[in-house]
Every structure is written in C-alpha cells, then in structure tokens.
C-alpha cells in the first residue's frame, strides 16, 4: 500500500494537545492493523532540546539511537507502542545545519541557497525519510507551534507542497484549535477557530478535519457553523473534550469518528478497529482500588513536564498493581537534615530522578539517607543513582566530603567521575553517552528479579559515572553492583543489603515504559511501596 501522510497543525493558542491528538490517532490506526510512525517538527533554531533548560522545554526524551528529542515523542511511543528514531524529531536548527553543510560541500553547484526550495526540500525529505525508514502505511507529522508564527512558515509551505506531490487521497490535514466557552454568556465562541483556519488557508492549506479542544460538547449547529466558515463538512468537525486520564483520549476520539474520517479521506484499506486491549486498560485505570504516595525529589518540580515520563511510568507501575499513584512534588533545595522527617513522613516511596548541576543536590542526598535508614523503598535514576552512591560513601564508609567531580572538582573522594571518553569534549550538544546500551545483571538482586533476564537494554543520557577506583571499598561495605556493562567496565545499577527495595540505575527506564507494558522496575517499585504502606 502506498504510504499516506497526515499533518497535524495547531491554531489560536499553543499547548492544545496536538501531540496527544496525533498519538491518539496513531493508536487508533494501529488498532486497525496499520503500520504507523509519528514525527514532530519543532520550529526553534536549537539543533535539539538537549542543551535547553527544562523550564524552557520540559523533559528531553531520548530514543534508542541516542537522539535528544521533544517530550511529545514520549507520548508517541507510549501510545503507539513503537520505538521511534532520530528522524522523528526535526528542528529548524537541524534542517539549516544540514542545508548549510551541503552548501559548504558544494552540493548546490554554486546556486543561491534559499528558504524555497532548499529549506522546504530538506523538510520534505525528512517526512519521506520516516516513511522509508520503517516501510510504514501512515506517517503522522505534528507541526509544533501555532499557525501564524513566523518561524512555522517554511514547515507549513513544505507540507503544502507534499500534498501536491503525493496526490489527492494520499494526505490529510488535521487542524487542532481552541473553542473557548464563555461561562457568563453561556456559549461557545467559534470566531478564533474561523480566523485560525483563514490564516491556514491564506498560505494554501485547507484543513480536511478540525479537532476542537473544548470543555463543553459542541452541538450540531456549532459544527455546521464551523464547517460553513472553514470550508469543510460539518461532520469533519471533531470535539475533543478534556479527559480525566490521557489514555482515554483515543477512545473519545474514536467515539467522535476521527479514525473513520481519516480512513475515508485517505482511502485506507484497513480492518475494523479493535480497541479491546486499550478499552480493557482504560477500564482498569478507572477502577484502581488503592493509592500510594511517592515523593519525587527534584530541582525542577515547579514544571511537572520536566519529569513527564517519570510520572507516567509511576502511573504505569500503579496500573500493574491496581493502585493510583499520588506524586508528592518535593523541591530538593528545600530538603534539609532538620526538616527531612516532616517532609518525607507521609510518603510510601522516594524517587530521585535525573538532572544536572549542583542546585538542590544536598537535599537529594539527604532524602536518600532518610530512605536508606528508614527502609523506605527508594528508586534513583541517573543523577539519583549517583547521589545514592555519594550518600553511601559519606554515611556508611565515612568518606567525609565524598562527591561527584561534576559538583565538586576538588573533592578528595570523587566516587562519581567524568567518563574517560568525555574528558576531551568541549561541545555540550549531543556529546553525552546517549541511547541504548546493554547491561548485564547479577542474580539474586532486585533488578534481576524485576527483569528476569541476564542482559537488558536501556537508554542512557549522562557524562559522569561510578568511579571504579572506589568499587572495592564500596562493595566491601555492602553496596551491591547489581548491573554492569557487559565488559564489566561501567556500573549501571546499585543496590544495598537489608532493605525492602533500594535501587539506583544509571540509565533512564522511564523512556521505555508503556501504559499497556509497565516497565519492570517501576512495577516492582510501586509493588514494594504498597507492601510497606500496608505494614
């Protein structure tokens, strides 16, 4: 079957849920037996979000092949349950970088390099590349930002040209827009949507389907009005109401007929949708019978999107144990030895996620000490694992001032140190240990009990690691090296004895968890937290 292309744009305001809409549609099409891939176009000039502040961008999601990408790729992977690649995130910076390098090599044979055709051709090639990479039936491309943003214009021109190139019936434009409800007037206003579509049509794109984000169900009259002024059939106006749980959205959009509309407009040869697995999962989510509280101790807690995959993975662990997970957000800068008892006394488990820099580091270490001494389930990820090693070195081995050389380059006991192959690297972007690496597990450990495999593969994003100069001293005092690289050079997982569940991992398991396939470590972490709570 010839590959079909779906483009999702946004209007009126940002953060409308284009990514969830694209991911939900991808799930519905996959449930019809189609092979689907999704990509995100981001109009910012950064090559990738790897060096951006979490306050600016939220989480950096890492793919198997080591790409640092937009957090929407996490939604895509969780919803369609497929591993994406570096080709699934395209930025203005990445495209211009490629075009300028081609110009320097002389690939354009002395021609004047311009936005049209050179930038737009590069953008089109990135769309077609995804189709070829995995031989998929459908490629869904989300265009970041809002129609009308000046930086989005080359992206919109590129997808306009693709519709012309692939021919009628092989592409579909979906516009996600806001329908504000004025409570005082008691009515939904359609004018912002009309103007957004007018802007889109002004650059040559006629939406085939309009998805309306609204807090109130829209009537047939409102659909007809939008259809009339936006030049589409009223039946092609879809209502996308607020949902209690993200994973309900595919079923809500199916009830609105979105996937049927897309199949009809793209003339897709596919089977009837089978949402039974997803429906069963959502039913389970709605009937969770218990609750556990997990203290997430981090430095970016004001912006929950900075830890979105961690939170979703905790929820997945809850699904597997029939409990809802209440995340208690704890700013690590505010945790001290004097207040740690009161701050953490009401949690059933403690998670310290990844991060960079010294801000809040002592609060994380203090929280880990409290979890270790009070036998509260602990899960450390990346920097969280490194902090666990530092805490153990200080308080069990008595190595006063032990630290990471990232935080204290002059420390007498650098139990965490820069990886040898990172020492001559000056550039910050894309130079860390990134992507999927193997890890060999030791038997009779919590990690092995969770995975039930000797060799696992997980995604990494770090420059610093466990310093092997301290391996012997730490293990002699009870630190367990539960997982290492296959050559035994890198320590990937640490645990401790005589504790219900204390696990630190150098990798990022949250990037591989799915709502229908919870990650084993998150599953077991929540399981033990439930047990400890019952006691």
UniProtKB/Swiss-Prot annotation:
It comes from the Bacteria. Catalyzes the ATP-dependent amination of UTP to CTP with either L-glutamine or ammonia as the source of nitrogen. Regulates intracellular CTP levels through interactions with the four ribonucleotide triphosphates. ATP binds at residues 15-20, 72. The active site is at residues 382, 508, 510. Residues 1-268 are annotated as: Amidoligase domain. Keywords: ATP-binding, Glutamine amidotransferase, Ligase, Magnesium, Metal-binding, Nucleotide-binding, Pyrimidine biosynthesis. HAMAP family: PyrG (MF_01227). Belongs to the CTP synthase family. Disulfide bonds: none annotated. This is CTP synthase. Allosterically activated by GTP, when glutamine is the substrate; GTP has no effect on the reaction when ammonia is the substrate. The allosteric effector GTP functions by stabilizing the protein conformation that binds the tetrahedral intermediate(s) formed during glutamine hydrolysis. Inhibited by the product CTP, via allosteric rather than competitive inhibition. The lineage of its organism: Bacteria, Bacillati, Bacillota, Clostridia, Eubacteriales.
């Amino acid at each position: 079957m010839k590959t079909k292309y779906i483009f999702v744009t946004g209007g009126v305001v940002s953060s409308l849920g284009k990514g969830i809409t694209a991911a939900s549609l991808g799930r519905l099409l996959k449930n019809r037996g189609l092979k689907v891939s999704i990509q995100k176009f981001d109009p910012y000039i950064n090559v990738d979000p790897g060096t951006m502040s979490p306050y600016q961008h939220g989480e950096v999601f890492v793919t198997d092949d080591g790409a640092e990408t937009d957090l929407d790729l996490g939604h895509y992977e969780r919803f369609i349950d497929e591993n994406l690649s570096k080709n699934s995130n395209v930025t203005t910076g990445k495209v211009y970088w490629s075009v300028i390098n081609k110009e320097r090599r002389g690939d354009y044979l002395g021609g004047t390099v311009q936005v049209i055709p050179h930038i737009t051709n590069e953008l089109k090639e990135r769309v077609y590349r995804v189709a070829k990479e995995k031989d998929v039936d459908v490629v869904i491309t989300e265009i970041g930002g809002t129609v009308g943003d000046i930086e989005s214009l080359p992206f919109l021109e590129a997808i306009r040209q693709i519709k012309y190139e692939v021919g009628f019936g092989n592409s579909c434009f979906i516009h996600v827009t806001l329908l504000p409800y004025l409570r005082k007037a008691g009515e939904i206003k359609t004018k912002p949507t009309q103007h957004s579509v007018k802007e889109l049509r002004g650059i040559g794109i006629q939406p085939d389907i309009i998805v309306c984000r609204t807090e109130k169900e829209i009537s047939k009259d409102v659909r007809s009005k939008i259809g009339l002024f936006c030049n589409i059939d009223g039946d092609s106006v879809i209502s996308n109401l607020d949902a209690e749980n993200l994973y309900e959205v595919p079923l809500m959009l199916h009830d609105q007929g979105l996937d049927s509309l897309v199949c009809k407009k793209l003339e897709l040869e596919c089977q009837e949708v089978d949402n039974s697995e997803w429906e069963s999962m959502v039913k389970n989510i709605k009937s969770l019978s218990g609750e556990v509280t997990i203290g997430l101790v981090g430095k970016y807690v004001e912006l929950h999107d900075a830890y979105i995959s961690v939170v979703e993975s905790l929820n997945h662990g809850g699904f597997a144990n029939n409990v809802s997970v209440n995340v208690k957000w704890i700013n690590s800068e505010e945790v001290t030895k004097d207040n740690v008892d009161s701050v953490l006394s009401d949690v059933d488990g403690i998670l310290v996620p990844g991060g960079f820099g010294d801000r809040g580091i002592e609060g994380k270490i203090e929280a880990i000490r409290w979890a270790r001494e009070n036998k509260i389930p602990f899960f450390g990820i990346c920097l969280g694992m490194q902090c666990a090693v530092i805490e153990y070195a200080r308080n069990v081995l008595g190595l006063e001032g032990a630290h990471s050389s990232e935080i204290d380059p002059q420390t007498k006991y650098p139990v965490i140190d820069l990886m040898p192959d990172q020492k001559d690297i000056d550039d910050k972007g894309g130079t860390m240990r990134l992507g999927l690496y193997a890890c060999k597990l030791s038997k009779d450990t919590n990690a092995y009990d969770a995975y039930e495999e000797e060799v696992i593969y997980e995604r990494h994003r770090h420059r610093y690691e466990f310093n092997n100069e301290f391996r012997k001293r730490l293990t002699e005092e009870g630190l367990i090296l539960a997982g290492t690289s296959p050559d035994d050079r890198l320590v990937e997982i640490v645990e401790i004895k005589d504790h219900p569940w204390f696990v630190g991992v150098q990798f990022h398991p949250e990037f591989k968890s799915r709502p229908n396939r919870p990650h084993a470590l998150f599953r077991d972490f929540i399981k033990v937290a439930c047990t400890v709570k019952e006691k």
